[in-house]
Regions:
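Long, low-complexity N-terminal extensions
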Residues: 1-232
Length: 232
């Protein structure tokens, strides 16, 4: 990222003012925080979605406290890269939104409606002085009546739908592999094995201890460590 020149320093200190060349520097810095986060990935296969992420592991940490894969509703989950404290706040809001939809309409929320809620919340933080952008990006994965979806939300609040995509520090390698080898008609087993292969190459890991993977079809299923070891 180019260095900020002295004449831009005033625009660098506030989120609510564009620089003369149309930039919001704090949003750009938030995106840099995402690039430094551990890798998170998602892909769609024939009947569902695979989400995966890497946990920062330390010897004495309780594994549950390091989670980056979040179940939001029975049919939707998410992975995040960047500041996990920011991610947890937003995930809590998404879970409430999903439950309100079930109570109000007696049906599960569709994936795009939930993603728009996330994008709107993140975008609001780019509008007002005294706030900062959320330093996190998400991949929202789920299956609804329109099929499987992977939707990215970045710190600006922009939403993109992908067949296969990665965020975080390993994204350049992972997205190159997706572009070269991804096939949308993969079955579940092939999709999970392909995802593990991409993770191993993008993060250069050899064991399953730091990997989290969820498979989403009718429901969210988070793979156990034993299941991951068999696939590795």
């Amino acid at each position: 990222m180019p260095a900020v020149l002295p004449e831009y320093m005033g625009y660098d200190r506030t989120i609510a003012v564009f620089s003369p060349d149309g930039r919001l520097f704090q949003v750009e810095y938030a995106k840099e925080a995402v690039k430094k986060g551990t890798t998170s990935l998602g892909l769609t296969f024939k009947n569902g979605v695979v989400l995966a992420t890497i946990k920062q592991s330390t010897d004495l940490a309780v594994p549950k406290s390091l989670e980056k894969l979040f179940k939001i509703d029975e049919h939707i989950a998410s992975v995040a890269s960047g500041l996990l404290a920011d991610a947890r706040v937003l995930v809590s809001q998404l879970r409430v939104k999903a439950q309100i939809n079930r109570i109000t309409y007696e049906e599960p929320i569709d994936v795009w409606s939930l993603a728009r809620t996330l994008g709107d919340r993140m975008q609001v933080s780019t509008l007002y002085a005294g706030l900062r952008p959320f330093g996190v990006s998400f991949l929202i994965g789920g299956v609804d009546s329109s099929g499987p979806h992977i939707i990215e939300s970045d710190p600006s609040g922009m939403l993109f739908e992908w067949q296969a995509y990665s965020i975080g520090r390993g994204a350049p390698v992972a997205n190159k592999l997706f572009k070269e080898k991804y096939k949308p008609d993969m079955d579940e087993k092939t999709a999970v094995k392909f995802m593990i292969d991409v993770i191993k190459k993008s993060e250069k890991i050899k064991d399953s201890d730091s990997i989290e993977i969820a498979v989403i079809k009718d429901n969210v299923k988070i793979l156990t460590e034993e299941e991951l070891k068999k696939l590795m």
